[in-house]
Regions:
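A short, N-terminal "cap"/entry segment at the start of jelly-roll beta-barrel domains
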Residues: 1-31, 111-124
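Glycine- and acidic-residue-biased ligand/ion/polar-headgroup-sensing regions
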Residues: 53-63, 68
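Short acidic-glycine-tyrosine-enriched beta hairpin
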Residues: 69-85
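A generic "binding-loop/recognition-motif" signal
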Residues: 51-52, 70, 86-87, 96, ...
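A short hydrophobic beta-strand segment most commonly corresponding to one strand
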Residues: 81, 96-111
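Conserved short histidine dyad/triad with adjacent acidic residue
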Residues: 35-50
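Short beta-strand His + acidic residue motifs that chelate non-heme Fe in jelly-roll/DSBH
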Residues: 46-47, 65-66, 82, 88-94, ...
Length: 124
């Protein structure tokens, strides 16, 4: 059993997006990667795709999701599931931070325009 304490979890981020690495292969979990993401008001992810399914469980705040060119709103308690190779981005248009826990298969990669596929550091 592995417990990743909040104080010991690695942190990443810039431009109003902060990510805390939770479960991952480098932190004792061979098959699942999980992380917590916080988008400050006005912050957004770049449009990207993934090589595996990703699930976002919204904990607080609201977010606007663009998935395959369609707009969706996400609020606390909602779960967004994104299938592989579907372009999406998420942004916080609200006045409060948006927070979610995200999961995908270990080894899943992100693909951002102009970059090759990569395993995000919080999921490695």
């Amino acid at each position: 059993m592995t417990i990743i304490r909040d104080n010991d979890a690695p942190r990443f981020g810039d431009d109003g997006v902060s990510v805390t690495g939770l479960a991952s292969p480098s932190r004792g979990c061979a098959s699942i990667s999980a992380w917590r993401v916080v988008l400050e008001p006005g912050a957004a992810s770049p449009e990207h795709t993934l090589t595996s399914d990703e699930a976002f469980v919204a904990l607080r705040g609201t977010a606007h999701v663009e998935l395959d060119g369609e707009a969706h709103d996400l609020g606390a308690g909602d779960c967004l599931v994104v299938a592989p190779e579907r372009p999406f981005r998420i942004r916080n248009d609200g006045a409060e931070p948006f927070e979610a826990v995200c999961c995908m298969a270990a080894g899943g990669q992100a693909v951002v325009a102009g970059q090759g596929a990569f395993v995000p550091p919080w999921a490695a």
